[in-house]
Amino acid sequence: MTEEFDQTEAERLVDRDMQPGDGRDRALRPLSFSDFVGQKAAIANLKVFVDAARRREEALDHVLLSGPPGLGKTTLAQIVAREMGVGFRATSGPVIAKAGDLAAILTNLEPRDVLFIDEIHRLAPAVEEILYPAMEDFCLDLVIGEGPSARTVRIELPPFTLVGATTRAGLLATPLRDRFGVPVRLEFYDEAELGFIVTRAADKLGIGATPDGAREIARRARGTPRVAGRLLRRVRDFAEAEDADHISEAVADRALKRLEVDAIGLDSLDRRYLRALTESFGGGPVGVETLAAALAEARDALEDVVEPFLIQQGFIQRTPRGRLATGRAWEHLGLVPPQSGQPAAPGGLFGK
């Protein structure tokens, strides 16, 4: 039975952040370093560190995984625990509201266990403070009581490995960042790597994909395995609706066109943004507030969700005067850019 296609405005198919349904196909995730596709340098180094720690029968040094959403940070943390042959506990920064919450988690760890904290940059400062001695000395310093009768109690912890994941490493406090002995930066995947991931996932889903069909999905996946998996599930729905026994290039192309994901991974919101910038404002410069009003979208949604990929792909520039469309944006839309020297487009004087 196929999954029902249901996409709200807040759940874009090409969004790199986790969405409901992304975790349903856990069997598709790699289980070992040898199964993990891409990130060759990072994986090679991690294998050395894990093998060395396992031979010494010590806890692996603390690991910081950073990079854009959807590249496999959670999966990699699970693989580290599995390769070490130890337990795995997972939580996230926003969930740990109080120092006591973290203390409860830490005191229940077994020796050499892996504790994974997603979105570690969102830890509260009070929680970070209790984490410092836990990471460095494997102990907790807790204050019991209040006022003159307050006293400090030190609790010894078993050696453990903290694996932190963040999409915004720059927001980590320096004392916290410095306590990670193994920093790992994950990069976007190339089309060949994503094609391999799609092919393998399609086989596990029981439908199969031709090399051209897998490549058609891969090149629209924004360099992100999570997006590739999401697009594959939707294309599978269309393939089964057409009684196709595999995903061919034609099947994938028809499905993705109906889903309004174009040849390079732009969706309808991306194209609306570019058309507003080029057709309504002459390519800019135009303030993001003006664009948000024209598109009836929140400014934060444009800055955090839409613009990063457009900037990365060279479609727009952020300037002190506002947003500017590049030549590639005009070309992608099939439009002719204005000649240099034309008057500034309306809206260019509005604030960023």
From Swiss-Prot:
Supply one GO molecular-function term: ATP binding
What top-level class of enzyme does the UniProt entry assign?
hydrolase
Q: Which residues hold ATP?
A: 28-29, 70, 73-75, 136-138, 179, 189, 226
Mark out the compositionally biased spans (Basic and acidic residues).
9-25
As for subcellular location, the record says: Cytoplasm
InterPro entries found in the cross-reference section? AAA+_ATPase, AAA_lid_4, CbxX/CfxQ, DNA_helicase_Holl-junc_RuvB, P-loop_NTPase, RuvB-like_N, RuvB_C, WH-like_DNA-bd_sf
* Gene Ontology BP annotations: DNA recombination; DNA repair
Recorded catalytic activity of this chain's protein: ATP + H2O = ADP + phosphate + H(+)
What GO cellular-component annotations does this UniProt entry give? cytoplasm; Holliday junction resolvase complex
Give me the ranges of the annotated region Small ATPAse domain (RuvB-S): 190-260
Keywords of the record: ATP-binding, Cytoplasm, DNA damage, DNA recombination, DNA repair, DNA-binding, Hydrolase, Nucleotide-binding
Ligand binding (Mg(2+)): 74
Q: Where are the transmembrane segments?
A: none
Q: What is its EC number?
A: 3.6.4.-
Region spans: Head domain (RuvB-H)? 263-352
Residue numbers binding DNA: 299, 318, 323
Keyword ATP-binding present in the record's keywords: the answer is yes
Just give the chief location class: cytoplasm
Chain segments carrying region Disordered: 1-25
- What residue spans carry the region label Large ATPase domain (RuvB-L)? 1-189
Domain remark from Swiss-Prot or TrEMBL: Has 3 domains, the large (RuvB-L) and small ATPase (RuvB-S) domains and the C-terminal head (RuvB-H) domain. The head domain binds DNA, while the ATPase domains jointly bind ATP, ADP or are empty depending on the state of the subunit in the translocation cycle. During a single DNA translocation step the structure of each domain remains the same, but their relative positions change.
Q: How does it assemble?
A: Homohexamer. Forms an RuvA(8)-RuvB(12)-Holliday junction (HJ) complex. HJ DNA is sandwiched between 2 RuvA tetramers; dsDNA enters through RuvA and exits via RuvB. An RuvB hexamer assembles on each DNA strand where it exits the tetramer. Each RuvB hexamer is contacted by two RuvA subunits (via domain III) on 2 adjacent RuvB subunits; this complex drives branch migration. In the full resolvosome a probable DNA-RuvA(4)-RuvB(12)-RuvC(2) complex forms which resolves the HJ.
Family according to the record: Belongs to the RuvB family.
Q: What does this protein do?
A: The RuvA-RuvB-RuvC complex processes Holliday junction (HJ) DNA during genetic recombination and DNA repair, while the RuvA-RuvB complex plays an important role in the rescue of blocked DNA replication forks via replication fork reversal (RFR). RuvA specifically binds to HJ cruciform DNA, conferring on it an open structure. The RuvB hexamer acts as an ATP-dependent pump, pulling dsDNA into and through the RuvAB complex. RuvB forms 2 homohexamers on either side of HJ DNA bound by 1 or 2 RuvA tetramers; 4 subunits per hexamer contact DNA at a time.
NCBIfam families named among the record's database cross-references: PRK00080.1 (NF000868), ruvB (TIGR00635)
- Entry protein name: Holliday junction branch migration complex subunit RuvB
Q: Give the species this sequence originates from.
A: Maricaulis maris (strain MCS10)
Task: Give the organism's phylogenetic lineage.
Answer: Bacteria, Pseudomonadati, Pseudomonadota, Alphaproteobacteria, Maricaulales
Q: Which gene encodes it?
A: ruvB
